[in-house]
Amino acid sequence: MNTVRVTFLLVFVLAVSLGQADKDENRMEMQGKTEQGKSYLDFAENLLLQKLEELEAKLLEEDSEESRNSRQKRCIGEGVPCDENDPRCCSGLVCLKPTLHGIWYKSYYCYKK
């Protein structure tokens, strides 16, 4: 019976000591994996940031092209309706109420002086 107790005690001590070693190895392995995972996350984050910056640059470029092409005229030509409070008629033109043939429009138009 003493032999069984000694054997059991020996197996128990070996299991505990090897279990501790495995626990330490597992802890170190997990730390290595988390550090490796952080480096992968940093890499993925940098890659995503680069893609977003490229996309933003393209969008800003399109906006600048769009604003260049869709620029409003700075003055209104002859015979075009205008606002009496904010006349934008070109030089040599005046924003006046139409006479005779344009009375029914009830609007102001750019006419030559």
UniProtKB/Swiss-Prot annotation:
Subcellular location, principal: secreted
Function: Probable ion channel inhibitor.
Species name: Cyriopagopus hainanus
MF-aspect GO terms: sodium channel inhibitor activity; toxin activity
Stated name of the protein: U11-theraphotoxin-Hhn1a
Keyword Secreted: yes
Cleavable signal peptide: 1-21
UniProt tissue specificity: Expressed by the venom gland.
Keyword Secreted: yes
Pro-peptide positions on chain: 22-74
Domain topic, free-text comment: The presence of a 'disulfide through disulfide knot' structurally defines this protein as a knottin.
Swiss-Prot/TrEMBL keywords: Disulfide bond, Ion channel impairing toxin, Knottin, Secreted, Signal, Toxin
Protein family per UniProt: Belongs to the neurotoxin 14 (magi-1) family. 01 (HNTX-16) subfamily.
Compartment list: Secreted
GO cellular component, one term: extracellular region
Annotated S-S bridges: C75-C90, C82-C95, C89-C110
